[in-house]
Amino acid sequence: MRIEEWCRSRLGEFLLFVLAVSLFALSHPNPLLPRGCALLAYGALAPLFLLVRWASGFAVVFWGGAYGAFSYGAFSYWLFVFHPVALCVVAGFSALFLAALCLALKAGGAFWQRRALLVQCLVWLGYEYAKTLGFLGFPYGVMGYSQWRVLPLIQVASVFGVWVVSALVVFPSAWLASVLGQWVEESERNARAFLSAAYSHWVSALVWVGLCGFCVCAAKAGWWPDCTAHTRAKVALVQPNGDPRRGGIESYRADFSTLTYLSDWALERYPDVDLVVWPETAFVPRIDWHYRYRHEQQSFQLVCDLLDYVNAKNCPFIIGSDDAYKKRTKEGNWERVDYNAALLFIPGVNVLPPSPQRYHKIKLVPFTEYFPYKRVFPWFYNFLEKQDARFWAQGSEFVVFEARGLKFSVPICFEDAFGYITREFCARGASLLVNISNDSWAKSLSCQYQHLSMAVFRAIENRRALVRASTSGQTVAIAPDGRILDELQPFAPGVLVADVPIVTCACGGYRYWGDALGVFFCVASLFILIAGGVRHMLRCRRGGWR
């Protein structure tokens, strides 16, 4: 059997599929390589592009769907710990999206045969941006994030965001697939034939090498936007290593004891701390609610203990907690509305009675925190509730806190995975980004590093220091250029006191045009596919339908 025939066989397609899934998962943080392997990312998509090239139309849809389900299933396996339904939802939607994407890749290659390499690369990049949008937005798995530790290369994100890094990572896969595909389809497969296939794409390869070289040299020469600190701030990041989802007043009291112990340890050794940060939902009882409505005496008492504790200190506290209000329904009844909140308490100012500055989480996790289609799909909403989904109301205001002259914002949980959110905070005056998260439920180091990899890009894009206080990790301090300044050991209680640089100037092209490059990839790929389809139809009409 010839190599080309073998590659087009079911066994060949299956092996390409397995290789594609494996390389995608290994490129990003995973159980085998908790920090991922950045080098593998440059060829991770080549097996998929070859599979699309050689498979028939129906097979392309099948393998695309299978690739979506298995690649994202392997990538985000930790969702199973949260709930099997969550993993099924991600795998299911990924299967649908990748089936459609692979069909688009096949069409793009057929419509623009001579330029198939660039067209397929563009279509993939357009997909990566599109999959971060809307209710189903899922930024995990963007290829650019695999390079989070390659600091000289990713400094270009300060101008064009993560999308330019993705372009640099995806192109070699498309190039390699094009060269290998051309070589396999030759009648003679020897070194000369391979070099001939590679030579036919030498211009695009040279441009890619030049762009990568420029990015690295520009970083070494300091050409990218300046991130010189004007002042510094000392922040205590508390990592209790608990699990707020356990529930029960005794569990909440035990977590509170751990939080206060770690905070006291930090404040005794570093009395000049500017801010103490507790993670997302670190204190579960609704502070303002239980202080106002004292029906649950044990919760009220725990709230009083918290307020007395904070008011006795000499520095502000950011506390991740539930926040609730009474709201009148359309039927005229009153109901409680819950928010996932970050609360700023300043001792002697807004602690007793509690009237903290508030930020309510705007970008909620689909299906597990938020489902806006209750009236359209009431049966599915009820199903999610029975699966222990915790629904929150959606916040609407981008809040910039201010304490001791420091202006900062607090993206909650996976909000630091979306560039437009942190960009908006910085546009409104934030000079420090403080992320509070709870990834403890996943019990996965690779999950925590996947989250961290995206946070690194948010720091670079905005040229702002970003600190993370996470329940079980990764609790880190990130410099404006993406360097990890310090990091706590994961899955252990501790507190990280970080002295971080504060940049106040508006610097970096990303601050001005945001995700414009991602939008361009998306719009351009749609235009090229439509133009290619029209061009193909016109040619068929001229040649006669057969």
UniProtKB/Swiss-Prot annotation:
Q: Which Pfam families match?
A: CN_hydrolase, LNT_N
Q: Name one GO biological process term.
A: lipoprotein biosynthetic process
Q: What is its EC number?
A: 2.3.1.269
Instruction: Fetch the InterPro entries from UniProt.
Output: Apolipo_AcylTrfase (IPR004563), C-N_Hydrolase (IPR003010), C-N_Hydrolase_sf (IPR036526), LNT_N (IPR045378)
Catalytic residues (UniProt): E280, K361, C413
Q: Does the keyword Metal-binding apply?
A: no
Where in the cell? Cell inner membrane
Q: Name one GO cellular component term.
A: plasma membrane
Provide the function of this protein. Answer: Catalyzes the phospholipid dependent N-acylation of the N-terminal cysteine of apolipoprotein, the last step in lipoprotein maturation.
Protein's name according to its UniProt entry: Apolipoprotein N-acyltransferase 1
Specify the taxonomic lineage.
Bacteria, Pseudomonadati, Spirochaetota, Spirochaetia, Spirochaetales
